[in-house]
């Protein structure tokens, strides 16, 4: 608001003075200032809104001799404009007229009633139906981070403490917050620089004592031990800032936020940012949602179920007991899925309706939907009654009865209420006697007017006389211009038209006052009764939220039961013995988009068979085979059935993928640098229980550099880390690894040549591939025949040279470049030296000692 800084308020109208005072309280965000039927913006706000929303920029009055820039949007369309701004990461303060223009002396009283920010929206029109909308806060202390997320549209409050930047980057990608709060002194700006909705906050908002006080006050507790977060010092700093920001923007209490949960890495399968991206879990590599795992698995019938399924996909569980309970529920629900899903569909997005109820922003149709949801509960219970499994019984016990609340809403709210309570007609007839009386008075107007019109027409003999109502002038008696000279003296002219005159008489004026008063009284009483409904519903909020969560889970499990039936999935066996054994495995996404039948393949990994060296032609299916292994393991760890004939899945702590690569131009990193960064992350963090996918490692550099790196990485993964590894490569030299190392096995994807054409069999066979078929693939891609012919000649020359050259022998021992288990003694000694504490003589002695170590 630079243009309005340092202005003399006395030179402005009282209305603009009021604007400046309100804008000073919200200098960083857009202020929507209500003026009649419009929300107006001024100065820099107007210019910015004009650009962002493509609305007209006009002028109003003057400041310092210059016209004041102004832009506006109609009040009835404001939600559409807010939705667009929120998607761009903007925040908006909504300033409403709260005074009565009729009784106000000077400008109507106004105040900011809510602040709409990307991370704190709860309005249905502003939210993506099937995506969580998270507000997040981040804090850093050295290498470690504190991270908190809040979904204000459900009350879900989570914290974690990522140990390093890689883990923090993975958390940011997993949660994908709409708005991120960070402290002024935040060190790792490169982690968050490219995100929308960044909000810089003062350091004092992250004070740990203030955070504890805020959280205890919110939850009504003396300490946070019961939530398991008492010792999470970094996470609590982030949580305190986040909660304060949520309260400041909502301008109301947040009763639906009733607890906080600590998320620990070891609770789920850990996946870094590259793995989530490469496996295309909820977003494909182009940024869309088509052809992702979620797109295949998500046929949920409620939006809250869809959001829960995506959370499960992004955080696969390692709690075997919980996963087996999900499997049991899916097996049981397969019998009743077609009968149960129609009732679940009618429940709707109860989770977000309850959040709006808690924030007291629920609209009449929200209450009607809540009533409709309650009406489904008996049928849902009836459908579930025959199922005798612990997991289903648990869900049934969590779904409340709420017969009294259903009865209340059936009596109180009309069948099809209007959008807004201010439109009237929300409260049902018969619910409140006084309201019925006021409405009868207001609604009786038409009968009275008909009687008055007949009486006056007959009494005066004026056949053109009629009685009507106009929104500007109120009630009137209209007589044609030709008969207007015949009206009696007590007819007072109210309006002149081209062909008629309109009059008012004392009797009609008295009735008009009575009707308008009754309409106003009815609307005021209706608003009071509507607020009273909130007071009657909110004491049950905790049980309602619990029921909504149970119904969302029931929707997810019923959906997974339907998917298992429809897509021919089987229940995997979750074992405590290390290894992965899959018979007839299929890629869940690729098999859905292929026109021809998908070729299933087996996979066997164990401590005795821990690495597969995978060779075969481009387009042969190596990447698909590797990804399908990771996706089957992931699906098993969300409790889902899997695309296979049979599957036994042992303990898996992490999934890593190093597949495909592209230049990271924004960070100035080449394809090869991206590849090596991801590889380094795997070599540092993988364990013997990790599943590692390595696809074409080393191809981004020269042949011998690449081969050397690939060999050394394979050795390190097989010998030192002993991870379960699928290692796809075009370096045929690597197929000699099984001869040199235990637990390494060659497999290949088959292909057949027929003359100049090639047929990919897509089947995995034991042993190494005989050739790469690169030229055949190039021909398939449409490379000109003369180029293919020349390439065949050159290939023969190179193969002859290679066979004759003594340098073609690769010594595996020399190529283990990265397998440096033992650090250099000289480096260790250097790291232990404090140069500032040495005398010149001591420094010289150290030089001699280091020389001996080399």
From Swiss-Prot:
Listed CDD domains: ABC_MutS1
**GO annotation, cellular component aspect:** cytosol
Say which species the protein is native to.
Pectobacterium atrosepticum (strain SCRI 1043 / ATCC BAA-672)
Chain positions recorded as ATP binding sites: 616-623
What does the record give as the function of this protein?
Answer: This protein is involved in the repair of mismatches in DNA. It is possible that it carries out the mismatch recognition step. This protein has a weak ATPase activity.
| InterPro entries xref list | DNA_mismatch_repair_MutS (IPR005748), DNA_mismatch_repair_MutS-lik_N (IPR007695), DNA_mismatch_repair_MutS/MSH (IPR017261), DNA_mismatch_repair_MutS_C (IPR000432), DNA_mismatch_repair_MutS_clamp (IPR007861), DNA_mismatch_repair_MutS_core (IPR007696), DNA_mismatch_repair_MutS_N (IPR016151), DNA_mismatch_repair_MutS_sf (IPR036187)
| GO function terms (MF aspect) | ATP binding; ATP-dependent DNA damage sensor activity; damaged DNA binding; mismatched DNA binding
Q: Give the protein name, as stated in the record.
A: DNA mismatch repair protein MutS
Q: Which GO terms describe its biological process?
A: mismatch repair
Which keywords does this Swiss-Prot/TrEMBL entry list? ATP-binding, DNA damage, DNA repair, DNA-binding, Nucleotide-binding
Family the UniProt entry places it in: Belongs to the DNA mismatch repair MutS family.
Instruction: Name the PROSITE patterns on file.
Output: DNA_MISMATCH_REPAIR_2
The record ties this protein, via Pfam families, to: MutS_I, MutS_II, MutS_III, MutS_IV, MutS_V
């Amino acid at each position: 608001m630079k243009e309005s800084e340092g202005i003399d308020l006395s030179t402005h109208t009282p209305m603009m003075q009021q604007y400046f005072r309100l804008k000073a309280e919200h200098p960083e965000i857009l202020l929507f200032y209500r003026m009649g039927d419009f929300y107006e913006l001024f100065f820099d706000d107007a210019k910015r809104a004009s650009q962002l929303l493509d609305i007209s920029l006009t002028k109003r009055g003057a400041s310092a001799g210059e016209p004041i820039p102004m832009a506006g949007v109609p009040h009835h369309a404001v939600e559409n404009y807010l939705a667009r701004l929120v998607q761009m990461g903007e925040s908006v303060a909504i300033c409403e007229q709260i005074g009565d223009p009729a009784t106000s002396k000077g400008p109507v009283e106004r105040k900011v009633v809510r602040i709409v920010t990307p991370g704190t929206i709860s309005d249905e029109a502003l939210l993506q139906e099937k995506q969580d909308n998270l507000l997040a806060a981040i804090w850093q202390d050295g290498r470690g981070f504190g991270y908190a997320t809040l979904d204000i549209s459900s009350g879900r409050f989570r914290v974690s403490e990522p140990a390093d930047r890689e883990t923090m980057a993975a958390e940011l990608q997993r949660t994908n917050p709409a708005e991120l709060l960070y402290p002024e002194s935040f060190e790792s700006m490169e982690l968050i620089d490219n995100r929308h909705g960044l909000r810089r906050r003062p350091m004092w908002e992250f004070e740990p004592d203030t955070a504890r006080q805020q959280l205890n006050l919110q939850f009504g507790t003396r300490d946070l031990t019961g939530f398991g977060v008492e010792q999470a010092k970094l996470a609590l700093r982030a949580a305190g800032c986040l909660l304060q920001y949520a309260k400041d923007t909502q301008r109301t209490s947040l009763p639906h936020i009733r607890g906080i949960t600590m998320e620990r890495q070891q609770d789920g399968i850990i996946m870094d940012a590259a793995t989530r991206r490469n496996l295309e879990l909820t977003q494909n590599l182009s940024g869309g949602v088509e052809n992702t795992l979620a797109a295949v698995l998500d046929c949920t019938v409620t939006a809250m179920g869809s959001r829960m399924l995506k959370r499960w996909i992004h955080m696969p569980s390692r709690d075997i007991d919980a996963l087996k309970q999900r499997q049991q529920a899916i097996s049981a629900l397969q019998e009743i899925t077609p009968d149960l899903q129609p009732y679940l569909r009618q429940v709707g997005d109860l989770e977000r309706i309850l959040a709006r109820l808690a924030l007291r922003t629920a609209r009449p149709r929200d209450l009607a939907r809540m009533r409709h949801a309650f009406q489904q509960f008996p049928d849902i219970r009836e459908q579930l009654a025959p199922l005798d499994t612990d997991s289903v019984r648990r869900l049934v016990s969590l779904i409340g009865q709420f017969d009294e609340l259903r009865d209340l809403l059936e009596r109180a709210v009309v069948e099809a209420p209007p959008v807004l309570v201010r439109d009237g007609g929300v409260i049902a007839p018969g619910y409140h006697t006084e309201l019925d009386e006021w409405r009868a008075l207001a609604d009786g107007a038409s009968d009275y007017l008909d009687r008055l019109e007949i009486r006056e027409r007959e009494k005066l003999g004026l056949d053109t006389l009629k009685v009507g109502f106009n929104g500007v002038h109120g009630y009137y008696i209209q007589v044609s211009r030709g008969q207007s000279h015949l009206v009696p003296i007590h007819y007072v002219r109210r309006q002149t038209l081209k062909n008629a005159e309109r009059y008012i008489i004392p009797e009609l004026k008295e009735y008009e006052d009575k009707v308008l008063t009754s309409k106003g009284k009815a609307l005021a009483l209706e608003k009071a009764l509507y607020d009273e409904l909130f007071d009657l519903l909110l004491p049950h909020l905790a049980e309602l939220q619990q029921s909504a969560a149970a119904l969302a889970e029931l929707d997810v499990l019923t959906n997974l039961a339907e998917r298992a039936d429809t897509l021919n999935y089987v229940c995997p066996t979750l074992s405590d013995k290390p290894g992965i054994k899959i018979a007839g495995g299929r890629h869940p996404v690729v098999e859905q988009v292929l026109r021809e039948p998908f070729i299933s393949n087996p996979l066997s990994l164990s401590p005795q068979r821990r690495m597969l060296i995978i060779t075969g032609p481009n387009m042969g299916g190596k990447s698909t085979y590797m990804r399908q292994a990771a996706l089957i393991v992931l699906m098993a760890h969300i409790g889902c059935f899997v695309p296979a004939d049979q599957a036994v899945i042992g303990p898996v702590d992490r999934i890593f993928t190093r597949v495909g690569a592209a230049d990271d131009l924004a960070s100035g990193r080449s394809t090869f640098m991206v590849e090596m960064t991801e590889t380094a992350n795997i070599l540092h963090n993988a364990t013997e229980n990790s599943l590692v996918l390595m696809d074409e490692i080393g191809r981004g550099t020269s042949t011998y550099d690449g081969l050397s790196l690939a060999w050394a990485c394979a050795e390190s993964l097989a010998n030192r880390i002993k991870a379960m590894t699928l290692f796809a490569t075009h370096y045929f030299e690597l197929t000699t690894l099984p001869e040199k190392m235990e637990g390494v096995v060659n497999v290949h994807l088959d292909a057949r040549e027929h003359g100049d054409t090639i047929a990919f069999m897509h089947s995995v066979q034991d042993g190494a591939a005989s050739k790469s078929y690169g030229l055949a693939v190039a021909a398939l891609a449409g490379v000109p025949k003369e180029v293919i012919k020349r390439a065949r000649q050159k290939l023969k020359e190179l193969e002859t040279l290679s066979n004759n050259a003594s340098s073609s022998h690769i010594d595996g021992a020399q190529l283990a470049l990265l397998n440096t288990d033992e650090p250099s003694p000289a480096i260790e000694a250097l790291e232990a030296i404090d140069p500032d504490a040495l005398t010149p003589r001591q420094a010289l002695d150290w030089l001699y000692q280091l020389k001996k170590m080399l």
